[in-house]
Amino acid sequence: RAAIGLYRAHRGDRPVKAVIYTHTHADHFGGVKGVVEEADVLAGKIPVIAPNLFMEHAVSENVIAGPAMIRRATYQFGPLLPTGPRGQVDAGLGKTTSRGTLSLIAPTDLIMATGDRRTLDGLEFIFQMAPETEAPAEMHMYVPAYKTLNMAENATHLLHNLLPFRGAQVRDPLSWSKYINEALEMFGEAEVLVGQHHWPAWGRQKV
């Protein structure tokens, strides 16, 4: 709710037309009820799009293993460390973990294969499946109209997190690298790269 409030303060009170979950980590879906009303999703007014097997992996990783992972996350991300005039110790992905309410609305539309397309509010999206990378169910998306490539959490401005201390599933670096290469081959004309946790990369050479 705070994030969309910040957006609307600068861009106007624009309605949410769709929700896309890129992968199964709670920091990428847990704020959904602050953005849309579940009743609107259930009524078919707002689609919620996610990669195949999203719910299975979201439940297994965040519910079944959740209590243990939450405890270990305090060691991985350091949310209890003090802040000071020179800043704070963090994990690189962000300054700290969220302490807000987590929520989840089940997807209404699953992306099943690389190359699947959806038109959302008149804008075309092309999806690329990237399972068993930074998350067990993950996908990238490309918006041709803006030449913008969204790599979910698979291309951020830090070292890839292959072995999470909190106990999330170990990542496959070979698969991860193959999906990055495939994205470059599929969407080589991209001019903007979005990595979600960090600032965009602008210009084809930087992408």
Language-model regions: role of each:
Residues 1-15, 139-143, 147-153:
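Conserved beta-strand hairpin/beta-sheet module of binuclear metal-dependent hydrolase folds
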